[in-house]
Amino acid sequence: MNMIKEFLNYLRYERNRSELTVRTYERSLEDFESYFNNRDSQLSWESVDSDVIRDWMESMMDKGDMASTVNNCLSAVRSFFRFALARQLVSRDPAYAIKGPKKQKPLPQFVREDEMNRLIDVPEMWGDSFQDLRARTIIILFYETGIRLAELIGLDDKDVDFAAHQLKVTGKRNKQRIVPFGNELEGALREYIYLRDQEWSTHDVPALFLNDKGQRMTRYQVEVIVKKCLSMVTTIKKRSPHVLRHSFATAMLNNGAGLESVQKLLGHESVATTEIYTHTTFEQLKKVYENAHPRA
């Protein structure tokens, strides 16, 4: 029995891995074996070294394989060598210290400033009903404060300080932060609360945003509202509350806000989390370059 089959049987019968997992490992190991045999017919599982493994990974990246695919293949080779070393089928483990490629984080999608301005400012976008006013207020609040969906749903009337123009927001792990807001959101909130209290004059729910039954809104209900509203002005695939959070951060940075200030407003523990939004400032830099460089 060859070494690969012995390892696959170990996965099946001793580790009780699914057949899908076993087949995935088999393909990765056979691919690596084919690679090093084609590279040098004298190479074997015993003689391959870390450089051969790294070259194999690089060849996959050159073919256009995603980092996640390369990491999965490397995981199979690592597992194989651990097994082979434990069974004394090889004398060393060349995959031990090899690190896989970092997965590229997708850039956050956001709604452009002109699209958000059209959505909020154009009267024809909205009706006069309680539902329309509530939807517009939710959109403005998300875009003006950058808070998370769960944070918006969790807002109570007592969390809104009109005098100080600030919200008390309860974020992840019940951490609280103060988020400022402007005159536009104040006006929208005051109008919404007035109409809400007429609609539900006897409600005893402390929530700021109530659904059509007078109860605290659910995640799904807010998601439906946001998706419907964003569909009126943008063609991006994701049209979620989190996209409005991205849009807030993008607009702040593009209009001169400092990274650490945006970090605090978003409630990020690390500024590294906020740095992903700096991709949008390239658009601003490109415009500056095109307007200023004589040869652009």
Task: Give residue spans per PLM region.
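Conserved catalytic core of the tyrosine transesterase superfamily
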Residues: 1-296
